[in-house]
From Swiss-Prot:
It comes from Cupriavidus necator (strain ATCC 17699 / DSM 428 / KCTC 22496 / NCIMB 10442 / H16 / Stanier 337) (Ralstonia eutropha). This is Urease accessory protein UreD. Keywords: Chaperone, Cytoplasm, Nickel insertion. Coiled coil: none annotated. InterPro entries: UreD (IPR002669). Pfam families: UreD.
Length: 289
């Protein structure tokens, strides 16, 4: 069936199918990017070492946006004992889909004694976009990972609202077959949950931060909670989830402005990095540009 906004004479552009495979391994005193394979417009910049032996890499998507029918597949493995920091240089824009779904699938695998910081910029969902964003994180015993995702519903800079479309957010965090946390969310632009007090309460920026590792304790969650804001415009909360052999902290942020939500997540990452990774936090140079 033709989308109602799509003229019959218009040819739907070809979709991008892009993949990126990265592997990091410890080589002597530092972590090296030992494998990089890509197909389509997903690339990684030359690794940098602003923190000694910790490998920093920036993932690039030159089109800068994801249109209907596009699919991005990112697979990252951090081998035993290695430490990688991954980021993106700018927001991922989810364009008007013309009735077709766009998707990004991320799989992160962290080995025993390995550490990962997954710090992408936010996702901006344009009006009439249909976006599916999934993340699977597998952390081996003794490994640790801190990461986040943020979504902005509508283009705040231009005043555009998100009035049509759909968003799927699927996340799984665990160790092998044992899951610590599974979430499958489906939000329609016209859903009453967007304005319900028990839902988004009219706010349009959602942030989630997870921290997995032996240091993810209830005491740490309580200490972090004391620093979090809770106002009509910016709300954050944290909880500790644990199973035999693994634990994690889950931080939720809901706000009206991306900048405010970003500050909460960055401040939380800085507070968590030492207890989770055993490494002091240093803000990424990328954030200052």
């Amino acid at each position: 069936m033709r989308h109602p906004d799509l003229p019959s004479s218009l040819t739907v552009p070809a979709a991008w199918q892009a993949t990126l495979r990265l592997r990091f391994a410890q080589r002597g005193e530092r972590t090296a990017l030992t494998e990089r394979r890509h197909q389509g417009p997903l690339l990684v910049q030359k690794p940098l070492y602003p923190e000694g032996g910790i490998c920093h890499a920036v993932i690039l998507h030159p089109p800068a946006g994801v249109a209907g029918g596009d699919s991005l597949d990112i697979d990252v493995t951090v081998e035993d004992g290695a430490h990688a920091v991954l980021a993106t240089p700018g927001a991922t824009k989810w364009y008007k889909s013309l009735g077709r779904e766009a998707a990004q699938h991320v799989r992160l695998t962290v080995g025993a004694g390995a550490r990962l910081d997954w710090l992408p910029q936010e996702n901006i969902v344009f009006d009439d976009a249909r976006a599916r964003i999934s993340t699977v994180l597998d952390v081996a015993p003794g490994g640790s990972a801190i990461g986040w995702d943020a979504v902005v519903l509508g283009r705040q800079a231009s005043g555009e609202q998100w009035t049509r479309g759909a968003l799927w957010l699927d996340t799984r965090v665990g160790t092998g077959e044992r899951a610590l946390w599974i979430e499958q969310s489906h939000l329609e632009a016209e859903s009453p949950l967007r304005t319900a007090v028990a839902g988004l309460d009219g706010l349009n920026v959602l942030g989630t931060l997870w921290a997995v590792g032996e240091g993810a304790t209830q005491e740490l969650a309580e200490a972090l909670a004391e620093q979090l804001p809770y106002t009509p415009e910016l709300r954050a909360g944290v909880t500790c989830l644990a199973t035999s052999g693994q634990s994690m902290l889950l931080l939720r942020v809901l706000g009206r402005q991306m900048e405010a939500v970003r500050h909460v997540m960055v401040d939380s990452w800085q507070a968590l990095r030492m207890p989770i990774h055993g490494v002091a936090a240093r803000p990424l140079r990328l954030w200052a540009t």
